[in-house]
Amino acid sequence: MYKKLYLPDSLTLPLLLLVFFSVALTAGLAQAEPLAPSIKAKVDVYLKKLVVWAADPLIVEAVKDSNKRGGIANMENAKWDELGDNDPLLMWLNLSDEGKLITAWEEDRVIDKLNLRDAQGNLVASSYISGKPRLYNNASRAPFQNGLKGVWAASEIQPDFTTRKKSVQIAVPVLLEGKAIGVLHSAVSAE
């Protein structure tokens, strides 16, 4: 004879949530496309480029300054959403010396965006080629978190959060004296 298993009420919800998120994660992984060798080769090339770009003294200094300031005063994602495409603040991020450098690097159309972020995930500089970044602060997003830790590339193709193009997210840490102080984030086109 089998006994029924009774769980204390304090365990029921956490267990159900665990099962739900396990199934959701598995379903999400099933939808992601694995990397074809040609895409993997492109990702490897651009990871190497991002490492070099992230070490540029202008980039390192811009991130260092943003960390010192704490990002743009009073900026948050809700306020960021309200900014128009021609807002002076957005133009400043694009037309600063580091923004111009990032824009020049993004002219290579294999990458769909290029964003520089400080240690808190705040946008430091961006290219205007791919349009306004969707988030001012992306500290909670995997590309930023993984880039800061040195886990540099996703292993699957998914629609990009900003451009909606099929791509592979890549991010590298911006280092100062061997310590990660920010992230240079891009997406390698898979189209």
Descriptions of predicted regions:
Residues 12-26:
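Bacterial N-terminal signal peptides
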Residues 1-11:
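N-terminal secretory signal peptides that target proteins for export/translocation
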Residues 80-83, 89, 104-148:
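Extracellular/periplasmic ligand-sensing ectodomains of membrane signal-transduction proteins
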Residues 186-191:
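Helix-start (N-cap) segments at beta->loop->alpha junctions
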Residues 128-183:
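Extracytoplasmic/periplasmic ligand-binding sensor regions of membrane-associated signaling proteins
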Residues 94-103:
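Short amphipathic alpha-helical segments
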Residues 36-43, 91-95, 136-137:
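Solvent-exposed, acidic/flexible segments
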Residues 31-86, 110, 152-153:
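Juxtamembrane extracytoplasmic/periplasmic/luminal helical "stalk" adjacent to the first N-terminal
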